[in-house]
């Protein structure tokens, strides 16, 4: 079942690029969270998306928001990608695909790659409630950053 606006966000723990566990409910104690699901590390649009969030860090910090980038890549690949692009947010490995299933963002076939993440963003408030959701069927498109920021500003 897909996670929808107004529903409780499925909690999860995933390993970050440094092989450290990151739990959504723990992150929410610090402020709202943007979950940024992406098809693949090092791909063009995914890099543009994460670098856009990176470059918005000051604005997001003012809203006490944390961005968590999530792909099905290994934490080894995510660590190399984070370093190569000088990213400041945690990148999480959903290698076993449990979280993309819980959020309903599994792409069954993208140019021959099976069961990777669709490009999707969720804004989760500090109570764990989903306040914004955007799932893109075309992975070449970027999320609507303005709507993400508007959802955060409304909290």
Located regions from the model:
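Chalcogenol-based redox active-site neighborhoods
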Residues: 1-155
């Amino acid at each position: 079942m897909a996670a929808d606006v107004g529903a409780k966000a499925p909690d999860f723990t995933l390993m970050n690029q440094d092989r450290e566990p990151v739990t959504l409910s723990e992150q929410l104690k610090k402020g709202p969270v943007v979950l940024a699901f992406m098809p693949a590390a090092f791909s063009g649009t995914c890099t543009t998306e994460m670098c856009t969030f990176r470059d918005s860090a000051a604005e997001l910090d003012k809203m006490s928001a944390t961005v968590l980038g999530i792909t099905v890549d290994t934490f080894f690949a995510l660590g190399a990608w984070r370093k190569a692009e000088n990213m400041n947010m945690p990148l999480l490995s959903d290698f076993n695909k449990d979280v993309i299933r819980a959020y309903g963002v599994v792409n069954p076939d993208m140019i021959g790659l099976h069961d990777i993440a669709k490009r999707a963003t969720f804004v989760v408030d500090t109570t764990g409630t989903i306040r914004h959701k955007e799932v893109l069927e075309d992975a070449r498109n970027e999320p609507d950053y303005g709507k993400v920021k508007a959802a955060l500003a409304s909290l």
